[in-house]
């Protein structure tokens, strides 16, 4: 989302600079024309953004309406979801792909979720959702005992994961890293991350589960 806004702003600035360059070179000698053209561009940009927002809301409404299919006909649900993904772009597409992977993981289709997350590269997600994306991928890979792949993901996206350690899902990041470290025979680091996971949440049920995992690792 933020990248989209950044590139849109840069594009608008470049267009405005182009008009001033054309005027300086004598191609455009009418200030009224220049200002009118700039105004037209801004109006088109605003209309384009409004249409994009309207389309996004329409897709989200459709996504909500088909959610009941997850329990009754998951294959049909994912077929409908794929149609929405194909029609989307930018942040919206990245977010829907993340949603698809999360849903697959929740219904115990982890290998499919991993394939989606591994083969897609979310260029438009904000830092928070990128953290969710790669944390989920890391956790699923460790869960499926694909430790080599998990290590590659951790090494490549460590900065993104660490940039989210102040968020409300920091305990999950620490726990997934701890599980990876434990499988890599780095027990001390694993315990350290579990301690940090406990410190980063007030949820007693989560703390209880993390403590149980810590006790298991310490045996």
What are these language model-derived features?
Residues 155-159, 183, 187-204:
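TPR/TPR-like (Sel1-like) alpha-helical repeat modules
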Residues 60, 64, 98-99, 135-139, ...:
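"A position-specific structural signal for the A-helix of alpha-solenoid helical repeats
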């Amino acid at each position: 989302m933020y990248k989209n806004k950044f590139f849109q702003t840069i594009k608008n600035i470049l267009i405005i600079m182009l008009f001033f360059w054309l005027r300086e070179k004598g191609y455009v000698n009418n200030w009224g024309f220049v200002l009118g053209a700039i105004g037209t561009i801004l109006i088109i940009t605003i209309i384009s953004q409004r249409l994009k927002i309207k389309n996004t809301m329409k897709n989200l409404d459709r996504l909500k309406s088909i959610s009941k299919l997850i329990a009754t006909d998951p294959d049909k649900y994912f077929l409908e979801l794929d149609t929405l993904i194909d029609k989307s772009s930018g942040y919206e597409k990245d977010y829907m792909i993340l949603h698809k992977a999360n849903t697959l993981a929740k219904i115990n289709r982890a290998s499919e979720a991993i394939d989606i997350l591994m083969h897609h590269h979310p260029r438009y997600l904000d830092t928070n959702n990128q953290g969710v994306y790669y944390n989920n991928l890391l956790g699923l890979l460790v869960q499926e005992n694909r430790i080599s792949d998990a290590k590659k993901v951790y090494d490549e996206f460590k900065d993104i994961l660490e940039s989210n350690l102040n968020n409300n899902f920091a305990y999950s990041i620490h726990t997934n890293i701890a599980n990876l470290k434990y499988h890599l025979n780095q027990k001390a680091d694993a315990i350290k991350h579990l301690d940090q996971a406990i410190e980063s949440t007030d949820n007693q049920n989560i703390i209880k589960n993390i403590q149980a995992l810590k006790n298991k690792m310490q045996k």
